[in-house]
């Protein structure tokens, strides 16, 4: 398998995270720019298991093993949500989101309001964070600072 395909990351996660291998934690979506950054949305089939915590591991040991394999690529593990507003907000991490407005549910268009200090973080270097969040969620995301609506 090519190291550049999203399935490569999922394969690494299955090797390092027993909860993914045994189906307790499920990878719901993945968006990747190989060598730069990957975003993975996870959910748990067991309310007792935190899906993000299971992926990161105690002291970050599980995520560290994956990061070692992908050599410098960043990996964001976030909670998947059936609610598109929550999922979009989660996908824009590490930025803080104030509000997500669905502008057109049918065409999957949303506006995200962030504090002005979070705008560059939400968009990311070269638009990378916004691009990966849009790919991950399947929504067109328009990010605005809270004062410019």
Locate the predicted segments by residue.
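RNA-contacting regions in translation and RNA-metabolism proteins
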Residues: 1-149
């Amino acid at each position: 398998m090519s190291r550049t395909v999203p399935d490569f990351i999922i394969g690494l996660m299955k090797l390092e995270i027993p909860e993914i291998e045994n189906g307790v934690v499920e990878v719901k979506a993945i968006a990747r720019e190989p060598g730069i950054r990957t975003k993975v949305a996870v959910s748990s089939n067991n309310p007792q298991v935190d899906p993000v915590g299971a992926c990161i591991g105690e002291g970050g040991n599980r995520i560290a093993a994956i990061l070692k394999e992908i050599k410098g690529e960043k990996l964001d593990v976030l909670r998947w949500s059936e609610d598109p507003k929550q999922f979009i907000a989660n996908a824009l991490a590490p930025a803080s989101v104030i509000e997500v407005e669905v502008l057109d549910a049918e065409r999957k268009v949303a506006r995200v309001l962030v504090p002005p200090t979070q705008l560059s973080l939400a968009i990311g270097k070269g638009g990378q964070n916004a691009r990966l969040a849009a790919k991950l969620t399947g929504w067109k995301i328009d990010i605005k600072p809270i004062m410019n609506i």
